[in-house]
Amino acid sequence: DKTKQKIAFSFLIAIFLAAFEGVVVSTAAPVIVKSLHNFKMISWIFSIFLLTSAISTPIYGKLADLYGRKRIFMIGISIFLFGSLLAGLSQTMHQLIIFRGIQGIGAGAIFTIGFTMIGDIFTLEERSIIQGAISTIWGIAGLVGPLLGGFLIDYLSWQWIFFINIPFGLLSVYILAKFVHEQKPATNPKIDYLGAILLSIAIGSLLYGVMSLDEDFYLGVILLVITLISSILFYIQEARTSEPIVPLFILNKSSIIVNIITFISSFILIACSVYLPLHIQSIMGYSATIAGISLIGTSIAWFMSSISIAKLMKKYPTNIIVMFSSLILIFSSWLLTQLTIDTPLWHLSIYVFFFGFGFSGTLNTLTFIVQDSVKYNLRG
């Protein structure tokens, strides 16, 4: 119905903005460095956004279960927009890094609660269409982000890559506030503050530790040791608290397998997203526009695969769908490893089409499995 269409539209807006902010800074980086006069810290405007969003994601999931999806999702978007405003007003690189961190904190809610609310509001067939649209939005953000960023920088200023989020984000908030209705949780919420702190330390030290290994090996090792210690303490804390951030009973054999498959699939996706455009432009000698057009098949395949998943799940066991999709993903990934400077561009376009089909089939099926395997109050 029209109400669901409006709600889906608001989700797509929010997810596009968060995805857009993850990629657009790469286009603006040279101009930002020139404006704020600090080249040494340029990498932090990328990494801090990813770091804070990764830390906040599981915490938002639990808060959504305790206080309601709509409330926490709108708080997350508001934090994201506030960070966008401050980032655009930054006068120094230190300020920009801090405000990008605030953006990432808000983006964590968009990434996790958006998918949770889709599972709550829409039927299986509707979810498959929306998941396909979301996959397409991610692809569009990756392709259009640098182009739109370049346009804003050339005709306005680099600050507008942040300011542009505000009107669209407010539109998303308005639609959600008006059309999404949910019951308030029946129980009095209790927040596991210690668990949230330990989880934040574990994730933050892991990500920063891995990033530090090349430049400062000993610092990286120390941070990874901190990750191990804080993870053990987090496990102990979750085992004894009444409202754990991550209920330990969901960490069964099946969920571990799902997470491993998701991690590997996402790892491959990120690697391809980073290196394929570089290969097309730097190795094969094509323009950025041609690179974007060559990779658009990934988004098309994502959408096609997502639409077909719901129908296939009614006819075949989900493990068969995941296995078949994973085989397509593995085979297409192997094809991509065979790329050379002489590989025709249309070959690469076919490879990424199959890659997108396999990735979408794998990840979307796993998402449906996870959402349908737990109660409403644990979906976050």
Show which residues each predicted segment covers:
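Cytoplasmic loop-to-transmembrane helix junctions
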Residues: 6, 41, 126-133, 290, ...
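12-transmembrane solute porter fold
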Residues: 7-13, 17-20, 25-27, 46-48, ...
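Transmembrane alpha-helical cores of Major Facilitator Superfamily
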Residues: 16, 44-51, 78, 132-140, ...
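Extracellular/periplasmic helix-loop-helix junction of adjacent transmembrane segments
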Residues: 28-54, 97, 289-293
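Small-residue (Gly/Pro/Ala) motifs that create kinks and tight helix-helix packing interfaces
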Residues: 29, 141-153, 206, 277, ...
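Hydrophobic/small/kink-forming positions within alpha-helical transmembrane segments
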Residues: 51-55, 85, 89, 139, ...
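Helix-loop-helix hairpins in multi-pass membrane proteins, especially solute transporters
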Residues: 57-194, 212, 376
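Hydrophobic transmembrane-helix bundles of small-molecule transporters
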Residues: 154-262, 268, 273
